[in-house]
Amino acid sequence: MSGRPRTTSFAESCKPVQQPSAFGSMKVSRDKDGSKVTTVVATPGQGPDRPQEVSYTDTKVIGNGSFGVVYQAKLCDSGELVAIKKVLQDKRFKNRELQIMRKLDHCNIVRLRYFFYSSGEKKDEVYLNLVLDYVPETVYRVARHYSRAKQTLPVIYVKLYMYQLFRSLAYIHSFGICHRDIKPQNLLLDPDTAVLKLCDFGSAKQLVRGEPNVSYICSRYYRAPELIFGATDYTSSIDVWSAGCVLAELLLGQPIFPGDSGVDQLVEIIKVLGTPTREQIREMNPNYTEFKFPQIKAHPWTKVFRPRTPPEAIALCSRLLEYTPTARLTPLEACAHSFFDELRDPNVKLPNGRDTPALFNFTTQELSSNPPLATILIPPHARIQAAASTPTNATAASDANTGDRGQTNNAASASASNST
């Protein structure tokens, strides 16, 4: 944890949330082995509100913080491991994290399987429990492993992890949702498949132009300069800055802008990017244009990183870590960057010999910010595969109501038909 105050995930303007009829119906029993089995009435994360009984066992604490507690558990019906995030619910408001997670369905975002409410030890205390995909590792722990061994993370993994992060950001930004806490600890990893999933939407918010937002958001080291300047009208490009900090950290083996305070972090940023111009300051926060900064020249990006760092990685970093928010690449543009060209090679494999995870199954929703980029993002071999798997009219009709999942190959199929 960064030690920063946790921002609320309760929507400020929502009406009081109604206590669910299934609230509190939690049963505890024992299975034939004597293990404790908890059965709750839970609502599926996606789809209609149809509460159902869900049983889980082997519960243990795997994390906690100012937000609450995270448990690992095993679903009794499937044997799958899940993570259960338990947070105190203010009964006056809907929980913003829940509202956002119910909208999301993407291969690079941790899935909300179910949610349920439970009572606390104190009277009238209500907890919201989010039942999520369990993913065993994080980018933070993997990067720390290499750093402690005095090694750098293999570049192929840097490409895989960052590409999938940008895909997840392109998806949530297409809904106007800003994560506001991108950092290595919130990037879950399956070490065998190299699949990355973005997690922890406790700080996420749907940003509306003209509506103010709190500036004390995002964990230290990853805060965009406009946040340090106290801006309240920022955009989802703060996530892009944070992602740029993650990329730089994976290349360097340590945070690029460390600092225990906003001033310390700003000093570190100025050491690399140089003193911001008056115009750049105006773009970040107009209230600071008269502030006097020491005049420091930008440090060449090639000297920031190790000599063997791929030039494309440095070039991408320089396009993400820009003072002016509108000058930063969008997540979709970042995915199309030449740094990721190796991933578009049909012969690329993981170092363990496995195939790379799904990288080109873009939805029309994901591509909505810049549809023409599909020609770069979906390589020819992926278009051919998508065309071969395009459903017949009958199948397509039966799939018409499957929502975002049903659109999975639409973009690739359209691209394939246009290229043949």
From Swiss-Prot:
Record's protein name: Glycogen synthase kinase-3 beta
Compartments reported by the entry: Cytoplasm; Nucleus; Cell membrane
Residues that bear Phosphothreonine: 390, 402
Keywords tagged on the record: ADP-ribosylation, Alzheimer disease, ATP-binding, Biological rhythms, Carbohydrate metabolism, Cell membrane, Cytoplasm, Developmental protein, Diabetes mellitus, Differentiation, Glycogen metabolism, Kinase, Lipoprotein, Membrane, Neurogenesis, Nucleotide-binding, Nucleus, Palmitate, Phosphoprotein, Serine/threonine-protein kinase, Signal transduction inhibitor, Transferase, Wnt signaling pathway
Entry-linked InterPro entries: GSK-3 (IPR050591), Kinase-like_dom_sf (IPR011009), Prot_kinase_dom (IPR000719), Protein_kinase_ATP_BS (IPR017441), Ser/Thr_kinase_AS (IPR008271), STKc_GSK3 (IPR039192)
Extra information: Higher expression and activity of GSK3B are found in the skeletal muscle (vastus lateralis) of patients with type 2 diabetes. Several potent GSK3 (GSK3A and GSK3B) inhibitors have been identified and characterized in preclinical models for treatments of type 2 diabetes.
Name of the encoding gene: GSK3B
Location of the region described as Disordered in the Swiss-Prot/TrEMBL record: 1-53, 386-420
Lineage: Eukaryota, Metazoa, Chordata, Craniata, Vertebrata
